[in-house]
Amino acid sequence: MAGYLAKQMGLPVGKLVCASNKNDVLTEFLETGHYNKKREFYKTSSPSMDILVSSNLERLLFFVCGADKTKEYMKSLAETGEYQISEDELFKIKRDFVGYACSDEEGAAAIGRLFKDASYVLDTHTAIAWAASDKYLRDCGLQTKNVVLSTASPYKFTGPVLAALGEEASGDDKADMEKLSEITGTEIPGPLSAIFEKEVKHRDIIDVDRMKDEVKKYASEGKE
């Protein structure tokens, strides 16, 4: 969405590649104009991409379709779990966007390849974006410059990043961060390394059916 707004403001870019993992609801939408959240949900190594409902898409629809149509589509999504935009609206979106979905395996391959070729350590989300970008360039036969927006630190996802680099994670967050730092020659971000010196404030694990009661409890305690 940020790339779209930048382009509208005059940034000279071509297509904006929307990358998805196995949860490919956006990839399907950008191809067909049909948004359908009634599908299986997958847990992947890029959890911030594990979605069935995209809030940014609603923002894009506002710019392309206007407020009234966006409200209509969101109402349909809430009530039926799906909606279909018009051919003209889809054409407008396709002028700027193309969607690609990549698997965990493709993301892991991107992490390994880029570290080998450029000594750069991708996180699992940026790896999906890199793999999607690579697919787009190969499909189009383009030799143009392509910018991949990196969204997170590999130190937040040490398990799958280490695995992609051919190393085994221990499951201990601190030890795995130190291992990743050692084998890649990169520094652990200060805010993450400082976590281990902080006091643990929240230890409760709450079942879903208890969430409302716990929220009321916390709110009540906060008023005292």
Locate the predicted segments by residue.
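PLP-dependent amino-acid enzyme catalytic core
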Residues: 1-224
